[in-house]
Amino acid sequence: SVVAAAPAGVEVIVADNGSTDDSLAALAAGFPSVTVLRMDRNYGFAGGYNRALEHIEADYYLLLNSDVETPEGWLAPILDCLDRNPDVAVAAPKLISCADRTEFEYAGAAGGFIDYLGYPFCRGRILRCVEKDRGQYDDERDVFWVSGAAFCCRADVFRALGGFDGDFFAHMEEIDLCWRMQLA
């Protein structure tokens, strides 16, 4: 769905984090226009993206998990938000569950906040209770962090802040980066 929904002029690049299955052969056969950046081993979410993005020159970095589905037209509002708001460093869509398209995705949903103890929580989920999507997060809104599952940021800000902290192999790296964006 990513290749089909990509606007003209957007290059789709897959960062292969040391896969050992036949996924790259399937990718090459099904999507020859996709560029693949291969890594020698799994560097984790943070390390893998940091290594891949060192080789990509762009105004924006759009990071998508491999299981994210993208409908037609989904990227335009995100890029428009960043274009209209030069002080916004990162933007993201709300994430709907693939298993139940009436509910938010468990991981990230619609961005989130940090409480006074430093605990991150997200819109669309309270602890283990996932909300139904009733349009309550269709608005453009400032949040403290967005999910790394679908993360669109200014490349210059990403580079200036040193990218993701590689000490986070997987999980919470996007919250850390968004926190550093807030402080910058």
What are these regions (language model features)?
Residues 1-9:
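Short, acidic, metal-binding catalytic loop of nucleotide-sugar glycosyltransferases
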Residues 72-119:
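Conserved donor NDP-sugar-binding/catalytic core segment of glycosyltransferases
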Residues 61:
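Short aromatic/hydrophobic "clamp" motif used to bind/position activated sugar donors
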Residues 112-143:
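Short, flexible, basic/aromatic active-site loop/helix in glycosyltransferases
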Residues 39-56, 66:
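Glycine-rich, basic loop-to-helix element that forms the pyrophosphate-binding segment
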Residues 43, 68-69, 88, 95, ...:
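Acidic metal-phosphate-binding loop of nucleotide-sugar-dependent transferases
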Residues 16-25, 41:
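A conserved acidic beta->alpha catalytic loop
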Residues 138-184:
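A short, conserved alpha-helix in the catalytic core of glycosyltransferases
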